[in-house]
Swiss-Prot record:
Residues 182-203, 219-243, 266-295, 335-366, 498-567, 594-636 are annotated as: Disordered. GO terms for biological process: bone development; cerebral cortex development; establishment of mitotic spindle orientation; negative regulation of transcription by RNA polymerase II; neuronal stem cell population maintenance; protein localization to centrosome; regulation of centrosome cycle; regulation of chromosome condensation. It comes from Mus musculus (Mouse). It is found in: Cytoplasm, Cytoskeleton, Microtubule organizing center, Centrosome. Residues 542-553, 625-634 have a biased composition (Basic and acidic residues). GO terms for molecular function: identical protein binding. GO terms for cellular component: centrosome; cytoplasm. Interacts with CDC27 and maybe other components of the APC/C complex. Interacts with histone variant H2AX under DNA damage conditions. CDD domains: BRCT_microcephalin_rpt1, BRCT_microcephalin_rpt2, BRCT_microcephalin_rpt3. Its main location: cytoplasm. This is Microcephalin. High levels of expression are found in the developing forebrain and, in particular, in the walls of the lateral ventricles.
Amino acid sequence: MEASGGVGGAFLKDVVAYVEVWSSKGTENYSRTFAKQLEDMGATVSKTLNKQVTHVIFKDGYQSTWDKAQKTGAKLVSVLWVEKCRMAGALVDESLFPAVNTDEHLPNLSRKKHKCMQPKDFILKTPENDKRLQKKFEKMAEELQRQKAALDDDVPVLLFESPRSLVYSSPVNVMKRRLQDMKEKRENLSPTSSQMLEQSQQNPCVSLFETSLNISHQPLSSDESFASGSHSSFGDSCGDQERKLGRSANEMTTVTCPSSPVLRASSFYGSASPNHLRQPRPQKAPDSPSKESINCQKDATGAVADSERKQAAGVSQGVPDEKLCLSPTMSIIEEHQVRLGPKNSSAKRKRAADLGSSPKGKLKKRYKRKSALAIQLFKSDQSPPSTIRLIPGTPDVEASSYEDYFSPDNLKERNSERLPPEAQQLASPSLFHCRGLSKWERRNMLEMCDFTCIGEKHRSISSISDLISKSASSLEKPVKEEVNTASTCLLLVETSANDSPGLCSQPGPQLRDDTGPEGSSHPDTLSSSAHHITPLKGNSTETRDPGDGKGSPKEGSTPPASASPEDEVHICNLSLGEDCNVEKSVEEKENIATGYSESVKNGPGRPDPSDSSCTGLVRPQQKPKKSEKEEKPTRTLVMTSMPSEKQTLIIQVVSTLKGFSFAPEVCETTTHVLVGKSARTLNVLMGIARGCWILSYEWVLLSLELGHWISEEPFELSETFPAAPICRLERHLSTQQYQGTLFANQPKMFIAPASSPPRAKLCELVLLCGGQVSPAPQLASLIIGPYKGKKKARIQYLSEKWVLDSITQHKICDFNNYQLLQ
């Protein structure tokens, strides 16, 4: 029993405790519960075992903790010491509750390992509560300050002047140093436009390769990185080619360098003005080259350029209304040529001169051989026409452009090589953009395409749309079939449960909303899907009612003279319209007495799963049986007047030691009632009436200490509830279902509807103690509770407390002390 003055005091204020309490298997840590109790009593709980600790609450903990506690001289006590201090309200002698170390004499190899299966509380680490993180932040701050101090004026600075803007500030001396380093490392520097013009005159190979190599470097963000990357990628290859072949500068001007497949593009406005180069969307104002250099180049390559222009003019005259469109890769090249400005102008003129100087027959032969690879460009009204042809190269160079060829940007270009002109004209609008196509653009492009020329079978867009609609309908079919199948199975279970007498009825979630209040199916549902229903196998000759047993009385029937108390309760409830939740069938009561009650394992309203009549039914929501070790225990335990922290500890102990399941109220399977505070509750009275153990909280604590359930008798609350051991012994000695005899010799009682505790509970208590309950006040000699009707002299009107006190003391109390005022 709990001491009245010991609760809430700070009588352990001088105690500094370290708690280490584990389960006997070493998988559950109960330290937090006992630490909370110590804090409530005023003790200081330390998270670490240090020199300030005076008491160590130890149970099945680490051997290192035990050794350290003995070394420091702290007092090792068990969990019972904490409970005794709480009950006594004062500091109890520690020698009465010494801690036990079961692993002290065991070898190191056989010691149990502690592995807590409880989830830890997640605490977000911040510099304020984590020293390691704080040190890391301080070190980062010191490093940042050191780097700032080491910065000088020569280091480039990134300036974020406004959102989404970045200014790169680089002093001149840094650029000089960078150029010098690049020269020493023999790297190709990023040339200016004038340097690129000179380079194109000296080395025509470079000007021919620029266009093809711009493809792979277009995604680079800055022009500087683009120029340095492109020139470093092809400069060395051209130099090596010159050294290998040993060609002179004159030979290089007449022969095209075959180091890569070159895309030769000549842009012009139209046949009327073919001499001017097209520069769409200029982003920078390029430095225009001098007229002298242009005229000089024009004189040197005039004849060849004229022939080239005539040829291009012939192409444009052949298709005067069409705009020859660039693929995404070509538009990337053209856009970057505009950025580079005059360099590409000179490169184009120089390239025209180089190609023009080659023999005429060779060119014709080459064009005939590669006519299938020519990229025909398409119609557009927005930009002037231009022609692009693919010039062949050696296998080595083709291997070097392997990545570019298989890049996603060139996918449509490769597809366009295989498509005829009609299909390409329809696909042309999507090829202007350098970016990827959106879903909307892709769909529009597919709608515009004519696929009649592709493959052997001709299929129109309407047939394709029909195919798509068919596929969509085929995708929807399985879903509908699954729904139909589910509804068929549902109806099959319903009809087999209600219509066919040879099948076992199975109430439950399978019927859902399709069954009426009595379990019958709706007629329209059955008639609409009657053709889906097929008979089930596995018939039996017996049907079972899931609600009541064989011996349960029917409604409206008159009870026999020798009716059991359960039958009387049933009749009482039917006449009054209230459910007392007490009545059970005779068959179920006998099953509980013999030890195989289905009400615990399968619930009171479910049929026996081992019944052979249910073998033909499919139960999707019922899980397969597990082994007997994992089955739910048949004994239930009820807690009453128990604080929440104690409830948590009891739940953990029961889950560790096994053998019990929890129930919210005392029922026919309850064997133990744990009482937190010695207060008379309905669960305590129900436990007494059913012959249960009425135990204190210490029984669980000592069982936890020893690692198994111990004898209950020393912890039975027989002083507070004298009837508890008497009823328990009567239940133990009874060979059949236990039935109390306290009210067996009392006259019939009528429980008033306004009684407190509730009428149903009082009815159950009276019947469990052998009394008789009358459904009407005219048939009773005792009326329990406040009665508003006309009172008669022959009837005793007693308070509800008479029933409660009689059950608690296990004797019939005097009526005179419980008479209600007339």
